[in-house]
Amino acid sequence: MMTSPLTQRGALSLLLLLMPAVTPTWYAGSGYSPDESYNEVYAEEVPAARARALDYRVPRWCYTLNIQDGEATCYSPRGGNYHSSLGTRCELSCDRGFRLIGRKSVQCLPSRRWSGTAYCRQIRCHTLPFITSGTYTCTNGMLLDSRCDYSCSSGYHLEGDRSRICMEDGRWSGGEPVCVDIDPPKIRCPHSREKMAEPEKLTARVYWDPPLVKDSADGTITRVTLRGPEPGSHFPEGEHVIRYTAYDRAYNRASCKFIVKVQVRRCPILKPPQHGYLTCSSAGDNYGAICEYHCDGGYERQGTPSRVCQSSRQWSGTPPVCTPMKINVNVNSAAGLLDQFYEKQRLLIVSAPDPSNRYYKMQISMLQQSTCGLDLRHVTIIELVGQPPQEVGRIREQQLSAGIIEELRQFQRLTRSYFNMVLIDKQGIDRERYMEPVTPEEIFTFIDDYLLSNEELARRVEQRDLCE
């Protein structure tokens, strides 16, 4: 059955009147403006009666499609600039920096609706977390292509990516860096110092302040070690390196050092006197040292007994000399004779009834062969031989008077009846008696073991090979 064109136009008008009005719906962030429309996607069966009413020639069958921050590329069956006619298919895309949410392609349906919805959402990366001991600055917040540059606090070094860029997939490029404390602490030692040793000492007590230490990162110093003596220690002569090392929390370390120099003021080395020797305190030539002059057996000192090393590095006084001991036998008493030997010489008094006594001859012969050992031990021999009035007393070649001989015998209880001998120390005390001849070695052993002072013992060690 054929219908007239008028009838068709009336049916189309009725269809338009019966279709509900489409009110554009706008959602925040949808990408559509409030005065624009979009259609939800659904499947629609078009009745046969209505299908005959569809007209592809109507230019504006659906609402004009417009997507904010994006673009709709449409293809109409009519071609040309028809972008919303029935059957028009539009490809949806977003500007750079935006992501399409929804359908990529929609079509204008007979229901005058578009077959789906879509909008453009701005691409944003998540907010970057702050890093310990550091920060970052971004060129455009968290938006696409924004570059965030990291930096560390003073004293820290950045390890990892220095910059991160917000990419199109909404993720940041690279990885999260860290700030690492790699800078060592700052340490400053006290200045080097020099000090003179005190009088009669070879050391000096030196004090100093602790080093100045500061950490360039978090300010925390965990440990400071010292290599060398502590402040206030006694330092010997010479240069001494004092080293401090500081450690921070990250086990970085820094060291500094300074020098402690101790000087000893010294005088020129003294020479011992001829036929004598020196005993000195301390090192023997340092400031405050005292050197005493001593003479060998059979010699006596002429001049000052000691000299002192002064701060001017010169010795006080003048050196004495050792001269052969002069024994005055022309004295009025035995006491006057013995006083000349007090603290200077030991005495070995040999008494015999007559010069022909075999013990006497044997003893004198052995002693004459041991003059060196006797002199080293400061021993003077006095001989008392014979009977009055022919009795003889002598010290070396000097003769003693009969009165002195008699007093000596009485003081030391020496008989004329038989051979006897007495050993007297430097203080005038009877230390040993002999009734028979003894070898010089026996006498020397007794003196070395019991009568020598510490000074003389040291001297004996120095001279142990002298008489050999």
Curated annotation (Swiss-Prot):
GO terms for molecular function: hepatocyte growth factor binding; identical protein binding; signaling receptor binding. It is found in: Secreted; Cytoplasm; Cell surface; Synapse. Residues 1-25 form the signal peptide. It comes from the Eukaryota. SMART domains: CCP (SM00032). It holds the Pfam family Sushi. PANTHER family: HYR DOMAIN-CONTAINING PROTEIN (PTHR46343), SUSHI REPEAT-CONTAINING PROTEIN SRPX2 (PTHR46343:SF3). Gene3D superfamilies: Complement Module, domain 1. Expressed in angiogenic endothelial cells (at protein level). It comes from Mus musculus. This is Sushi repeat-containing protein SRPX2. Its main location: secreted. GO terms for biological process: angiogenesis; cell motility; cell-cell adhesion; positive regulation of cell migration involved in sprouting angiogenesis; positive regulation of synapse assembly; regulation of phosphorylation; vocalization behavior.
